[in-house]
């Protein structure tokens, strides 16, 4: 147990709530602030890509004994269902029994706040933080930026307030603070596949559904109530874009042509399309993440990524796992804890940002590409035979807790091998033969 401190966590989202549980269990007084109303008392909809919980997320939840409470609201998905225009393909994610888990962001966030309150954390909603004094961890709270502010002093402040973090914004005014953000030229919009009348799912509920169409794509993840949360990813401008779909008929014609099997399961398509906002996708990087032993950024506040590997929440939760490891290692030496935390996490945050961007290219174009599908089949056969020699990149990221940076490096090495293998004569017919197996073994020796 550490010496008890008075700690503020800014942001009551998933990472902020879980961090509050960890800090509370370590013996601290924890106050969680959020500028928004209590999510448990309002309807939550319109801009949520469902979450895909995988190993790193479960490890962090199980680390404070709340994993089973979250498993109750999660649906396992053991495969991709790839909806081509004229056929449906299934592609298993990992080994037998390996799944990612679909969870509604709103449902999970409510659950996490309940769990944090039960652990003893105190929540303060509709509290607007306009500034923080870094040197003495003082929050400045008020109704407006130009009105009167109240000061609340803490021993330490954690910024878990997302990609557009107010705490980070204050740190950016420091000398030698590096910061970059990059928006994709595409956005996303939420749509909904309702449940059948008997509350069953209209599509296979244990699949991550994806309609890959190159520059744009549709995905759907299952919810407990029998519905699916769908997300349409499209460029903002251009021929096939949000800008180009200006009336109901254009939207319906576009879906009829490009996602024909989705039309019958999205009855409110046009209404959803024009009612729900179009949201942006941003990658944000910065460094340092900490200030002395007073301030630390965590989760999206220091490494926002695009959602195409389903790792945003998992990476944020893993920040907490690593922070906790440093707490156990260095006790009350918070300066050392913060330094080691950011040194450990920064290269891995950069790696998952890169992997997420690349996976967008994979999901949107390659899942419909015959050569890519052949590569996946060859990798699967070889990996099943030689699990000690080949763990596919997706499995390294999703079903292990080895560092993201290691997964990126090994994935690049494996990809180089597969490029050579796919050049073999008649590979389409000999892919599942000793010749191909031996070629991979030979290339692994180099």
Curated annotation (Swiss-Prot):
Gene3D superfamilies on file: FAD/NAD(P)-binding domain
Keywords: FAD, Flavoprotein, Monooxygenase, NADP, Oxidoreductase, Pyridine nucleotide biosynthesis
Gene Ontology biological process terms from the UniProt entry: anthranilate metabolic process; kynurenine metabolic process; L-tryptophan catabolic process; NAD biosynthetic process; quinolinate biosynthetic process
EC number: 1.14.13.9
Family as reported in the entry's similarity comment: Belongs to the aromatic-ring hydroxylase family. KMO subfamily.
PANTHER family per the UniProt record, alphabetical: KYNURENINE 3-MONOOXYGENASE
UniProt protein name: Kynurenine 3-monooxygenase
């Amino acid at each position: 147990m550490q010496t008890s401190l008075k700690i503020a966590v800014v942001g009551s989202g998933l990472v902020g709530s879980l961090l509050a549980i960890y800090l509370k269990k370590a013996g601290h007084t924890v106050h969680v602030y959020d500028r928004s109303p209590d999510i448990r008392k309002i309807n939550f909809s319109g801009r949520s890509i469902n979450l895909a919980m995988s190993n790193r997320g479960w490890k962090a939840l199980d680390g404070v004994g709340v994993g089973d409470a979250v498993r109750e609201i999660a649906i396992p998905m053991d495969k991709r269902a790839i909806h081509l225009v004229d056929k449906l393909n299934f592609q298993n994610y990992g080994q037998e029994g390996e799944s990612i888990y679909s969870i509604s962001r709103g449902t999970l966030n409510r659950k996490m706040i309940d769990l944090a309150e039960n652990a003893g954390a105190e929540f303060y909603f509709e509290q607007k933080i306009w500034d923080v004094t870094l040197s003495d961890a003082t929050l400045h709270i008020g109704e407006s930026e130009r009105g009167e502010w109240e000061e609340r002093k803490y021993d330490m402040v954690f910024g878990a307030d997302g990609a557009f973090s107010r705490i980070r914004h204050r740190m950016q005014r420091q000398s030698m603070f590096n910061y970059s953000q990059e928006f994709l030229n595409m956005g996303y919009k939420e749509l909904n596949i309702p449940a059948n009348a008997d509350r069953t799912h209209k599509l296979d509920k244990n699949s991550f559904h994806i309609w890959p169409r190159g520059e744009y794509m549709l995905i759907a993840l299952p919810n407990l109530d029998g519905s699916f949360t769908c997300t349409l990813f499209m460029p903002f401008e251009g021929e096939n874009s949000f800008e180009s779909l200006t009336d109901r008929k254009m939207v319906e014609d576009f879906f009829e042509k490009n996602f024909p099997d989705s039309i019958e399961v999205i009855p409110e398509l046009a209404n959803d399309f024009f009612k729900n906002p179009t949201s942006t996708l941003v990658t944000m990087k910065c460094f340092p993440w900490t200030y002395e032993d007073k301030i630390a950024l965590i989760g999206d506040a220091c490494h926002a990524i695009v959602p195409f590997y389903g790792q945003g929440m998992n990476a944020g939760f893993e920040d907490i796992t690593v922070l906790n490891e440093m707490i156990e290692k260095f006790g009350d030496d918070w300066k050392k804890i913060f330094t080691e935390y950011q040194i450990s996490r920064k290269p891995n945050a950069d790696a998952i940002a890169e992997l997420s961007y690349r996976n967008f290219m994979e999901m949107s174009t390659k899942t419909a590409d015959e050569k890519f599908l052949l590569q996946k089949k060859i990798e699967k056969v070889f990996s099943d035979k030689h699990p000690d020699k080949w763990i596919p990149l997706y499995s390294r990221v999703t079903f292990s807790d080895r560092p993201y940076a290691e997964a990126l490096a090994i994935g690049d090495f494996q990809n180089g091998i597969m490029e050579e293998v796919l050049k073999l004569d008649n590979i389409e017919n000999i892919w599942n033969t000793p010749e191909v197996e031996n070629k991979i073994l030979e290339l692994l020796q180099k």
